[in-house]
Amino acid sequence: MAGHSQFSNIKHRKGAQDAKRSQKFTKLIREITVAAKQGLTDPELNPRLRSAIFSARKENLPKDKIETAIKNAAGNVAGESYEEIQYEGCGPSGAALIVHALTNNRNRTASEIRYIFSRKGGNLGETGCVSYLFDHVGLIVYKAEGINFEDLFNYGIELEVLNVEENNKEELYVITCGVKDFGRVRDAFYTKFGEPELARLSWQPKDLIEVSDKELIDKLSILVEELEDNDDVQYVEGNFIFADKL
């Protein structure tokens, strides 16, 4: 029976992994569809779509699914209409969280997000309740490999960005710029350095809260994970960092 039990556990994990992969694909397709509907269907002329396709390819989303999503958006094929909504709240330890969602039913999504917050030791607040703790900026991220930081930094100065910094731990270069300058800066960096790992408008914390208590780290991690596991949630941003010693 031990062998049977082990096989069952493997099957269960495989099933969970497949479900996560399917959910990830659904979110990627949703982002591609929304990006294509909001702008041109040529990725070279629609940076948001180009970025969505780049992310989809990194996750090995089949090419035919990418093409179908774009064609459906271009042809206005009857289907669900999605809107972008931002939710704000606090988690354990007082950490501020901003939840970004694409939904076809705002009442359902708000109810589900509120339930996750309350069940995991947090509180969903009103719009603006925590966003004042962040700066709204354009965010562009490159992998450090193959790119000279000095070249990137000097180009950032030329484009008058807000900041260019190295994240040595993650081996990334992080560029921030004003929201109004985002399109210009993103396209300029793309032309000179190629497709970034990430390019989007982002809420960057003015100050970071360091969470060092093991129990709070676990609770906050679970809250963020459950939020990101929600079908309508694209990603979550926060103003906290976990202590390195843990």
UniProtKB/Swiss-Prot annotation:
Q: Which UniProt keywords apply?
A: Cytoplasm, DNA-binding, Transcription, Transcription regulation
Q: Please list the GO terms describing molecular function.
A: DNA binding
Annotated Gene Ontology cellular components are: cytoplasm
Q: For the region Disordered, what residue ranges are annotated?
A: 1-22
Q: Where in the cell is it found?
A: Cytoplasm
In its UniProt entry, the species of origin is given as: Wolbachia pipientis subsp. Culex pipiens (strain wPip)
Q: Which InterPro entries match?
A: Integrase-like_N (IPR017856), TACO1_YebC-like_2nd/3rd_dom (IPR048300), TACO1_YebC_N (IPR049083), Transcrip_reg_TACO1-like (IPR002876), Transcrip_reg_TACO1-like_dom3 (IPR026564), YebC-like (IPR029072)
Keyword Signal attributed: no
Q: Indicate where this protein is primarily found.
A: cytoplasm
What's an example Gene Ontology biological process for this entry?
A: regulation of DNA-templated transcription
The protein in question is named: Probable transcriptional regulatory protein WP1214
What protein family is recorded? Belongs to the TACO1 family.
